[in-house]
Structures are given as C-alpha cells and as structure tokens.
C-alpha cells in the first residue's frame, strides 16, 4: 500500500514577493465579506495578501473581482453562504468565520468544492459567561425592572410599595441552575454560579465520565431530568437540525412551574411563540434572551412583543473591547496560516478537515490503486464543465491526469494570470474596493468597526440529540 495515499491532501496558496529587477507580483486576495473595518486584520496579512472589504449582505452585492480572485474570505454572521453562493467564488480556498458558529455556511458544500471552513471557538468565553450571570442575577433580583420603574418616575415611599414593585424577587442560595451544554462557556458559568450559592447541574451527553467530579457539579443524563430539577435553565449549546426549538411546548411542560430561562447561545433553540405563552401564563416566571431566532430583534414585532417579564439584549454577550480584538486577530491569523502553509495541516480550527483527507486506496482495474476522496472533495470541480469551473477545477490533488497533482499555488497563479489579463480592460472600481497605498490593488479605507458581530457560543462536541426532542416532533 502506498503510504502517501493515507496522508492528508494538501493545498498551498501561492505567495510571491517582489523581484529585485521585476514588476510587483500580485498577492493572494483576501476579502472581508460582510464588514468594513480591516484595521486589525491588515497588519497581520499585509505582507502576504491584499485585503479588501465588501460590506455585503449577500453574494449578489459582492464585486466580481472578489468572486473571481479571492482565495480567502473572512465573514461575520450577517451573510449566508449556501452551496449556490459558494459556487460563485472561482478561486476560494478558505473561509474563516469570525466567531464560533458556522450555521450560516453550507460546510458540506464547501468541503465538496475544496474550500476549507474555519471558525474561532475560543474567544469571548469570559464575556458570555459574565453576561449569562448578569442576566440570571437580573431575573432573580429583578434589577432591570426596578431600575426602569425609577427611571419612569415611580416613587417608593414605604415597604409596601417596595414589596409590590419587587414581587417575584428570589433568593439564589440553594436554588438549582441547570446548564444545557458544558463546554467552555457552560463550564465558566458553572464556576461563577457556584460562587453565588447555586447548586449546579448539567446535561451534556458527549462529555466523558468524571467531568462532573473534576468541577464539583452534578450530572444528569436526560434533558427531562435537568428541566424537572432546575429552578433556572441556561442554554449553552450549538444550533443544529436535532435541537431546533429545544425549548418548545413539550419541554416547557417538563420545567418546574415558575422557573427562569436564559439563552445566550442560539436564538433558534427557543420557540418564541411557546415562550411568550408560557410567560403570559406564569409557567415561566421570567426569561432573558441575548439571542433571537430572527435578528436583529425588533421589540415591536414577533411573538414576544407583548410578553411580560422578559429581558432582551442585542446579541452582544460576546463583546468587550478585549474580546473583539482577540477574535479578529485569531481569525486573521488563521487566514495567514492558510496562505503561507499547507491546507489543512496548518489550520487550527478547520471544521471540515475530513474533506481534505485521503482514504485507504481501493483496488482499481488491473490492480492499480486509486485514491478515493470523501464526498468527492476537490474532485468535483476538476471534472466539472459548469460555468463555475474556474481555478477550482485544477485542485484535484490526487489526479494523475495531465501530468500529476495540481496545487492551490498553481490555481492561485492561474487566478492571478486571469486577473492580469482582465486588468487590461477598463473597468470601474467600486467605492468599497478602494485603492490602497503602496501599490496594492485593494485595501481598507475605513476604521469603523462593525457593531453587529457574532456571539462566541460555546458548543457541545456534537449535536444534542435528546429523548425529549424525539418525543416532541409535533411541537411548534
């Protein structure tokens, strides 16, 4: 067996410097798809790539130059990349999601097209955990509503008025906090909650035995048990097809009457209509949501618009000045690793690495071994005749047709050559792809940081598949 066939398939994005007596060589193009500020990314990438911003909400707003030439893309959570969107990019080799969630990217399609998808799962853990505790404390002590009463001019002249206004305030010590998911953020919340006197339990079917003992927590093995035992439920898991509307009519009935609910994970985990009804009926005493199924959240629209005892914040749990800088630096560094190294070897957080791994060889006709790629990764475009067949079509790394494997470096070189030919034709440069000082074709012109960034939700190692969900397929 040829041992080379068991090795990862490697792609390399070509990086060329200046020749002493020659023209400036074009660098790989990296695009920020749905933002404008590249001031943090530029110092990390400027010596190996040209950086452009698109400030787009969909691929229809992305300039043709980026679609044809970009080998790397940075993106927040405000743009969605479906398979059809991904096929518009002719030279793309890597996407880095500035955040932890990748639910706005068709990861499977990206892998089949030879595009590595990476995220930044480790940033903002402290910020989200702190925000979670802030929301929990507000629900228990009703600080948010009491502050609003004072702001509206209400006067408290005696204990009876205080008692009336603060009705529903609860003591924390001795209550049970139930965490759905005990990853980075869930663990951070657990440690903070214990300091306040909570009895902390958790449900996470994907963690090894003993994690509860190492943290001094109590583990339950079904979601029903967690909901039944918890005075406050806090969600800390990713969103996928298995746990969409995890909090629904059926699961709310499993909760203790008058329990609290907190969600700083993903909006789609909660069915808004069912939650609104539960708040009106008092089955859930109060709820706090930093994330919403439809964002940006509009307090005057949707099922929750007239729900009582509800705190909503604008998907900002992840944010602090320090975490925002850290997040963007980590994302840009991942792009840099892809440019100067081999994909997927150098990538720290590639979520579809399996599409770049070779499987054991299968016996071909005449006894010749043939390399097989999972899902046809990198193979599809090598034999495609669709209009989208650009430089991607040269990245069948295991093909022996045409003299052997072709690297991403050659693909990038082909894109550069095509761009050079296109440069001979007059074409206007859009305002958001402005010239950069120093001879680089594109760059940044704004230092305004995007205010709407993704949350760094901690995640379970896989999807939460619960008995409750299987039993509640009829729930809204």
Swiss-Prot record:
Q: Which GO BP terms apply?
A: chaeta development; chromatin remodeling; negative regulation of canonical Wnt signaling pathway; negative regulation of DNA-templated transcription; negative regulation of transcription by RNA polymerase II; positive regulation of canonical Wnt signaling pathway; positive regulation of transcription by RNA polymerase II; regulation of transcription by RNA polymerase II
Recite the UniProt keywords alphabetically: Nucleus, Oxidoreductase, Repressor, Transcription, Transcription regulation
A single GO cellular-component term from the record reads: ISWI-type complex
Q: InterPro entries recorded for this chain?
A: CtBP, CTBP_dehydrogenase, D-isomer_2_OHA_DH_cat_dom, D-isomer_DH_CS, D-isomer_DH_NAD-bd, NAD(P)-bd_dom_sf
List ligand-binding residues for NAD(+): 100, 180-185, 204, 237-243, 264-266, 290, 315-318
Q: Where is this region: Disordered?
A: 445-476
| One Pfam family cited in the UniProt record for this chain | 2-Hacid_dh_C
| Domain of life of the native organism | Eukaryota
CDD domains (UniProt xref) = CtBP_dh
Please explain the role this protein plays, according to its UniProt record: Corepressor targeting diverse transcription regulators. Hairy-interacting protein required for embryonic segmentation and hairy-mediated transcriptional repression.
Q: Which family does it belong to?
A: Belongs to the D-isomer specific 2-hydroxyacid dehydrogenase family.
Q: Indicate what this protein is called per its UniProt record.
A: C-terminal-binding protein
Source species, please? Answer: Drosophila melanogaster
């Amino acid at each position: 067996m040829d041992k080379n066939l068991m090795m990862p398939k490697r792609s390399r994005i070509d990086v060329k410097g200046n020749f002493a007596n020659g023209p400036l060589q074009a660098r790989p193009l990296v695009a920020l798809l749905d933002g404008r500020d590249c001031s943090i990314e530029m110092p990390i990438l400027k010596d190996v790539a040209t950086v452009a911003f698109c400030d787009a909400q969909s691929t229809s707003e992305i300039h043709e130059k980026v679609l044809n030439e970009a080998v790397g893309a940075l993106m927040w959570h405000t743009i969605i990349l479906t398979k059809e969107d991904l096929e518009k990019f002719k030279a793309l080799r890597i996407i880095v999601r500035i955040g932890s969630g990748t639910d706005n990217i068709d990861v499977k399609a990206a892998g089949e097209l030879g595009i590595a998808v990476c995220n930044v799962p480790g940033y903002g853990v402290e910020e989200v955990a702190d925000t979670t505790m802030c929301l929990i404390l507000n629900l228990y002590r009703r600080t948010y509503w009491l502050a609003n009463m004072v702001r509206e001019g209400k006067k408290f002249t005696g204990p009876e008025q205080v008692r009336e206004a603060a009705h529903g305030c609860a003591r924390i010590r001795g209550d049970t906090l139930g965490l759905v998911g005990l990853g980075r953020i869930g663990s951070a919340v657990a440690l903070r909650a214990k300091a306040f006197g909570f009895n902390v339990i958790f449900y996470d079917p994907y963690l090894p035995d003993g994690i509860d003992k190492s943290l001094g927590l109590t583990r339950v093995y079904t979601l029903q048990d967690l909901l039944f035992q918890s005075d406050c439920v806090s969600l800390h898991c990713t969103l996928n097809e298995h746990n969409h509307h995890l909090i629904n009519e059926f699961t709310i009935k499993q909760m203790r009457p008058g329990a609290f609910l907190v969600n700083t994970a993903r909006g789609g985990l909660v069915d808004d209509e069912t939650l609104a009804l539960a708040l009106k009926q008092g089955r859930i005493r109060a709820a706090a949501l930093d994330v919403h199924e439809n964002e940006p959240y509009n307090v005057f629209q949707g099922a929750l618009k007239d729900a009582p005892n509800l705190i909503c914040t604008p998907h900002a749990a992840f944010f602090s000045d320090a975490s925002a800088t850290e997040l963007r630096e980590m994302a840009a560094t991942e792009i840099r690793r892809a440019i100067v190294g081999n994909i997927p070897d150098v990538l720290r957080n590639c979520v579809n690495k399996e599409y770049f791994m070779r499987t054991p060889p299968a016996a071909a006709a005449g006894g010749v071994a043939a390399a097989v790629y999972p899902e046809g990764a990198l193979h599809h475009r090598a034999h495609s005749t669709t209009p989208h067949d650009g430089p991607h079509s040269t990245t069948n790394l295991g093909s022996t047709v045409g003299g052997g494997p072709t690297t991403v470096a050659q693909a990038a070189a082909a894109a550069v050559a095509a761009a050079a030919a296109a440069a001979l034709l007059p074409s206007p440069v859009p305002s958001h792809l402005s010239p950069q000082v120093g001879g680089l074709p594109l760059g940044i012109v704004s230092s305004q940081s995007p205010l709407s960034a993704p949350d760094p939700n901690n995640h379970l190692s896989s999807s939460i598949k619960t008995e409750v969900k299987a039993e509640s397929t009829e729930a809204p």
